Amino acid sequence: AVEAADAVIAVSSGMRDDVLSVYPGLDPNRVHVVKNGIDTDVWYPAPPERGESVLAELGVDPSRPMVAFVGRITRQKGVPHLIAAAHRFDPDIQVVLCAGAPDTPEIAAEVSAAVADLAAARGGIFWVQEFLPIGKIREILSAATAFVCPSVYEPLGIVNLEAMACATAVIASDVGGIPEVVDDGVTGTLVHYEAADPQDFEMRLAAAVNSLLSDPDRARRYGEAGRQRCIDEFSWAHIAEQTLEIYRKV
């Protein structure tokens, strides 16, 4: 079906390369890139809804820096790498893990043990395993000094757009389509990932977190630039027009 299509849409240039490598007979001129969009009227810098703060319920200290992760517990999302890196975070940094829906019992047990070890080694670890409504996720993203995306692969990484739309700096691996979302040194920090050397990635990730969170002004600049980038380049109106243009040409 893919090779017979008049047009194929990939969500990033990285995904386009992957499609062409899997389907070598596919005409490259028929493979287009249209990135996923973000609704900046849904994702925006926001205080707690109706005064009900999920962070206050968790016991997060608003006077201390905090990094957040939101995602499923899978190998692809790199949660074990983030937990390992957090052992090297500066002691004042808090970590909010909104991580649930493990895809295997094995990784569920692995992450549970790793979080327990981390919490025993240092304070400021908050693990939310249940599903949260958008309003509470928006509160967490908005309050975070930085959002951390340790994925080992992402076609694009919509969660990074959600964090950026909330005016939060992003620290992310440089895999897949992530570099097409996170502008290194402008909206966040990219960390090199090599599957053959995960320990190096974890050390680099910790160093990036410590560096950015020690400079709140830079984190704030990244966050402001990230929201503007979402508005300018990832609005659904912008994405829809790109999609329509492909249909017109076909």
Model region roles, listed by residue range:
Residues 169-172, 182:
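Short hydrophobic beta-strand element within catalytic cores of glycosyltransferases
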Residues 9, 61-77, 83-86, 96-98:
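Conserved donor-binding/catalytic core segment of Leloir-type glycosyltransferases
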Residues 44-60:
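A short helix/loop element that forms part of the nucleotide-sugar donor recognition site in Leloir-type
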Residues 108-135:
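Nucleotide-activated donor-binding/catalytic signature segment of Leloir-type glycosyltransferases, i.e.
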Residues 14, 37:
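Carbohydrate-associated surface elements
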